[in-house]
């Protein structure tokens, strides 16, 4: 809605896309389904923090795909990105718990970017993610892709 998470996801996808032999799909949670989960070798889950948790659309994605992928994607790599207004830890923890149920393996600690948006105006304002934060997301995407390409993950 305000663009912060999308900027983070695009940066991670750009980093991953530079690895030879790795195909990257950048999908919105509302558009992604069980087949997308099943055909991927790794996952970067990006969500805004909404009311101290992951977004409703991300929760809907997990609700729609969880059982279709259960016991079929064990051991695959994942990473969590959170664009938060104040904290983001609960959103990251929610995703980590779902990923643990899928028996996914984290490649890094969740990356939580805090925008410090605390008023309704700040929360609803379009976000401009700083270059250093986008670079960190790009680096994490590259790490994911490199690890997959080398068979580490």
Model-derived features: positions:
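Helix-loop-strand module that forms the ligand-binding subsite of alpha/beta enzymes
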Residues: 29-114
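Generic secondary-structure signature for well-ordered alpha-helical cores
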Residues: 17-21, 67, 100, 104, ...
């Amino acid at each position: 809605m305000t663009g912060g998470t999308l900027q983070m996801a695009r940066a991670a996808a750009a980093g991953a896309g530079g690895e030879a032999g790795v195909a990257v799909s950048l999908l919105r949670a509302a558009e992604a389904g069980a087949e997308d989960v099943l055909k991927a070798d790794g996952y970067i889950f990006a969500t805004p923090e909404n009311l101290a948790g992951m977004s409703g659309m991300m929760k809907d994605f997990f609700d729609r795909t969880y059982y279709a992928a259960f016991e079929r994607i064990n051991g695959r790599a994942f990473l969590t990105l959170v664009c938060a207004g104040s904290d983001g830890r609960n959103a990251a923890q929610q995703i980590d718990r779902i990923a643990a149920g899928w028996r996914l393996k984290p490649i890094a600690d969740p990356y939580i970017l805090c925008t410090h948006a605390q008023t309704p105006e700040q929360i609803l304002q379009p976000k401009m993610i700083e270059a250093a934060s986008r670079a960190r997301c790009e680096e994490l995407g590259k790490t994911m892709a490199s690890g997959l390409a080398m068979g580490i993950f």
